[in-house]
Amino acid sequence: MKKYFLFILLLMIFFGNAQAQLKVGDKVPSFQLQDQDGQTFDINTVLGKQPLVIYFYPKDETGGCTKEACSFRDSYEEFTKRGAKVIGISGDDVASHKSFAEHHRLPFTLLADKGNKVRKLFGVPRTFLIPGRVTYVVDKQGLITYVFNNLTDGPKHVTQALEALGRIKH
């Protein structure tokens, strides 16, 4: 009986958020979260107006996440030239995001998903106990046109997102 209980417990830990991941062609779900300035950000205020790059990352001020955020920062002008809004989402709180954004001079929106409700809405998978790193490129109609899932290479999310934006018909 103990072995059975342990097996079920391990399944829950590793696959506890096993919700279907959003895919190309899906509509971005409606959500509201606080940004790094404590303001409520409603995705519906930007859907239908411009392309979006929504990237989920594990944690502020960690090696891979800092590299990824700084890569988005360094390419921010390219995103704005293409009319896209960059949005980073993690489970960190508003204060952590504010510090992270200021420390690394991040010019884009960071959203605090403390209960991981939006991460779950998107079905972003975990790798063991680590929250996943997934980037979604969204067209003006609010449809996902590209999904890139790679936990270990944060900066590659930037190049993949820029390439995907280039394929969106305006």
Regions from the PLM with identified roles:
Residues 18-44:
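N-terminal "domain-start" segment that seeds a small globular fold
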Residues 44-66, 72:
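Short active-site neighborhood of thiol/selenol oxidoreductases, capturing the structured segment around
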Residues 28-29, 51, 132-134:
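Short loop/turn microsegments at loop-to-beta-strand junctions
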Residues 66-104, 115-119:
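Structural microenvironment flanking redox-active thiols in thiol-disulfide oxidoreductases
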Residues 106-108, 126-136:
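Structural micro-motif
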Residues 131-170:
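Thiol-/selenol-based redox modules, centered on thioredoxin-like
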Residues 4-14:
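Sec-dependent N-terminal signal peptides
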